[in-house]
């Protein structure tokens, strides 16, 4: 019988630190955006690229919490209220982009063209689920928003987030993979 006290419980320290750093980065760049003038409350932002990078490196739990925390804090600080349907959509996006993290090999320095293709197919799928399904449906259910408005916002967010992640997220993934040494200073002390 194994000793249960020797088994690790909870999230690894690296994942917890990554969530904190990822959420802080997203909040720090939250206001860096280009308004999409013809669609209300929709902007071209870099948030999705950071959430995708954290999820792609550390997995779906890191993606989930980076998306949830960063959107919640960003809305509270910069907009005075939290739009929960979009917070949840960012969390779902974070989970989905994190599902292929083992295949991407970013942390091992093995992110190449094949992994970039997998990353981008997955992020387009994740963006579609988050912004064409989750956000608009929750906008209708939670806030009784008009369906034509929220689906136009969703399509715009899908296109903007997909494009930003395609360019910025892919560049960040390549860059992180190239500088990754395989060792980390984030080790548990004895």
Indicate residue ranges for each PLM-predicted region:
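Loop-helix junctions at membrane interfaces
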Residues: 1-190
